[in-house]
Amino acid sequence: MRRLQFLSLLLLFAVSSFGDNKFTENFESSLPSSAPSSETAVSLASGQWKIKGVCGKSDNGSLRLSMSGNGYAVTPTLCQPGQVTFSHRASGSGKKLKVEKSTDNGQTWQEIGTATVSSSTPYGSSSFKCNSQEADTEVLIRFTCMSATIYIDDITITLNSVSQEQPDIDDPTYITEGAWVPTKPFPTAVKEIYLAPDGAPNGDGTFERPWNDLQQAINAATPGTHIICRGGTYYPKKQSDSKYTVRIKNSGTEQAPIIIRAYDGEKPIFDFVNQLYDQMVGDRGLLITGNHWWLFGLHITHAADNGIKLEGSHNRIERCEFSYNLDTGLQLGFGHKFSDTFPGVSENDGSYCAYNDIIDCDSHHNCDYDANYGSDADGFACKMHNGKGNRFIRCRAWHNSDDGWDLFETDFDVVLAECWQWESGKAADHLWVKDYITKSGNMSFSGNGNGIKLGGNGTGGSSKGVHYAFNCIAFGNNISSSVKGFDCNNHKDGHVLVGCLAFDNSYDYMFESGGSDANTKYYNNVCLGRQEIGVGYDDYNAIAVAMSKNGWTNHLVTNVSQDDYLSLDEDEAMKPRDIYGGLPRKFGRLTYDSQMIDAGSSTFEESMEVWQQLVSDFPFLQRTIQGKSRDLGPYESSYSATTGITTVNDSPAAAPCRKVMRNARIVIEKNGNYYNTQGQKIVD
């Protein structure tokens, strides 16, 4: 379990030495006169830095930090850095200097900005926001020279240390201000193309003279291009085929993907409302058949079919939103018959529509409209002959007309990790389609209303592969007595469910007999309602009331309820993500006295290659266990199962902390002072 950290207390005196809540360095002394070829620690006026490929040189009468190609300099540890400002000059024009931060002692880095540096005199300057959160108390900042030679000087970094006494905050966990940060840094752009809603086709795609046509930018893109979209609403233009669909046919490379991304701090919306006429139903918003694309921060709405249909491979769709489309928000795969898409190829060998990652995306209020409307549109789908290696990471789907996720007619394994789904199949959510589309005859709503549907058989054959759901949540799917939260849907090849939670569904879990016992496993899951388990092996799960048959049995915790959670309210589930894409931090978390704390086992995840690859690629998925065992369900609590007491940083000299009630709230008491769960001192 994750211990409460009080680094703000431990860093109080160290941070105060920077003075005026700022960190400064002007490189006037102690830099080597020649650049070291390996990482070297140097003591400067501001503290110990780490450098490689940089040295001190006189420029315009003052010492500067001189950086050769790929040289870098790393600051000392900083507490909650805010604005990073510095001066710069280069040996030529168009040089690039990347600025990154690390919150894990340099194991991983997140780009916060890239400066374009010229040879102008006097020095230019750049300023980037770190967007620190309250837990970011040990942060490193790295400056990297992407093209030699660059001089930097006069670095100033504001510090927003939580070591200062601050009043308690009722709900500090939903930080939405600031530019969104991708889960890994964008690679350096080879070329940049700018779009803006008020741009023009006769512009040149620069920041000053942007285009406004996404298709125009895509056609001009080559590997390494960044298409940067300013905020506002775009209405895609009719193309030469008389359709509004934006087609992505060209490809990037593994090292140089083509990126379409939101301009920092802004949200571009691509509204395909011009498709919403009877004769255009079936036209998609974006159709991606190319490979190695990365879409970040886009909102796709009002497409006459899928918001995005993804058929290419090695693509990354991140922080995108899909809403009010006339079919599934984001769909991977082809059609019922694979050879219809690839004549002469009878089946997918795994390389088509393969290795795509869908990360931190939201999909809601999508609904198809025909004679039996609502029966096809899901939040997300990977179906009809997908390839290998497709994953959904930390996505949400709600209020879609059919299902939240649909893995119908799959050909290979599909993985879901920390995904949330709720309230599918409610007709009242989808009256909006009648404002746009008119159909003759008696229209009836036919949404199935299932949550996470992990399989399905149709005219294109039976679904194949072992499907995985790690730490996922499904709730509120109950439009009839037969709908389910997690549903095998007659899939026979097997499932692995670890750390999932289901409640308020007609059936929380439905896994019928006839599937693969050897490939079906349930570990550390929680069921607050009904289940029907007819296949597979189970261990370390929890249920409200044990089933007399067709239910979990081994190491089973019973008599659990919604009272075991801080919140299971939809309003909490819908709250904004943080700037890093993280989901709301109250929903689905256990209370301090839940019997599900320390009641599970981490052995299963640790032995699974699929899970180990996930946490290697996405370290934020890792569940850090510091108690005696894993908690049941999706999230680890910060409480001890036996005493409710945690210690600070495992220090033998540290005073114990206690969780106590104060003013009807749980707070932390230490040495007579009170702190909230962010480590901030509560001031009366």
Where on the chain are the PLM-derived regions?
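C-terminal accessory segments
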Residues: 551-641
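Feature marks extracellular polysaccharide-active and adherence modules
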Residues: 158, 230, 261-263, 271, ...
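Right-handed parallel beta-helix/beta-spiral solenoid domain characteristic of secreted/periplasmic
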Residues: 210, 231-240, 249-304, 367
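Predominantly extracellular beta-rich ligand-binding scaffolds that present long acidic/polar faces
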Residues: 240-243, 255, 418, 461, ...
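Acidic Gly/Asp/Thr-rich repetitive segments characteristic of extracellular carbohydrate-active
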Residues: 173-187, 197-236, 241-242, 631
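Extracellular glycan-recognition surfaces and repeat-rich motifs
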Residues: 30-62
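Extracellular beta-strand/beta-solenoid scaffold signature
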Residues: 239-249, 274-286, 302-309, 324-353, ...
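C-terminal outer-membrane/trafficking sorting elements
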Residues: 642-684
